[in-house]
Curated annotation (Swiss-Prot):
Signal peptide (residue range): none
Record protein name field: Intraflagellar transport protein 20 homolog
GO biological process terms, semicolon-separated: cardiac muscle cell differentiation; centrosome localization; cilium assembly; cochlea development; establishment of epithelial cell apical/basal polarity; establishment of planar polarity; inner ear receptor cell stereocilium organization; intraciliary anterograde transport
GO molecular function: opsin binding; small GTPase binding
Lineage: Eukaryota, Metazoa, Chordata, Craniata, Vertebrata
Organism: Mus musculus
InterPro entries cross-referenced by the UniProt entry: FT20
Domain of life: Eukaryota
Subunit structure: Component of the IFT complex B, at least composed of IFT20, IFT22, IFT25, IFT27, IFT46, IFT52, TRAF3IP1/IFT54, IFT57, IFT74, IFT80, IFT81, and IFT88. Interacts directly with IFT57 and KIF3B/Kinesin II subunit. Interacts with IFT88. Interacts with CEP83. Interacts with SPEF2 (via C-terminus). Interacts with CBL and CBLB. Interacts with TRIP11. Interacts with TTC21A. Interacts with SPATA1. Interacts with USH1G. Interacts with CCDC146. Interacts with CEP78; regulating IFT20 stability and localization.
Entry coiled-coil feature ranges: 74-116
């Protein structure tokens, strides 16, 4: 009966017969909730560490991907510039070939003219020798 009167007043005895303000069942639930909260906070901390590691890994991979992308862009630009240089060199060589062909044709015409002059001079010399 004394327990009932104390219970109505909000006072309770625990298993060690100590006077408590809270009901022992509520106290037990509070302790369990506190432990669950601690476990939850620990798990959240672990989760944050894992997520932080994943974020760092993703950032690192993103940086590596960006570096590779820049290397690829650089290589592509280098290939384009090499192609343009080769095209310019090819045009220069074609112009040089055309110039050399023109020069060759000029030399051929000059050679034919000189051969004709030589033949005329030889004929003149032959006529001069036979006349004497």
């Amino acid at each position: 009966m004394a327990k009932d009167i104390l219970g109505e007043a909000g006072l309770h005895f625990d298993e060690l017969n100590k006077l408590r303000v809270l009901d022992p069942e509520v106290t037990q639930q509070t302790v369990e909730l506190k432990e669950e909260c601690k476990d939850f906070v620990d798990k959240i901390g672990q989760f944050q560490k894992i997520v932080g590691g994943l974020i760092e890994l993703v950032d690192q991979l993103a940086k590596e991907a960006e570096n590779e992308k820049m290397k690829a862009i650089g290589a592509r630009n280098l290939l384009k510039s090499i192609a343009k240089q080769r095209e310019a060199q090819q045009q220069q060589l074609q112009a040089l070939i055309a110039e050399k062909k023109t020069q060759l044709e000029r030399y051929r015409v000059e050679y034919e003219a000189l051969c004709k002059v030589e033949a005329e001079q030889n004929e003149f010399i032959d006529q001069f020798i036979f006349q004497k």
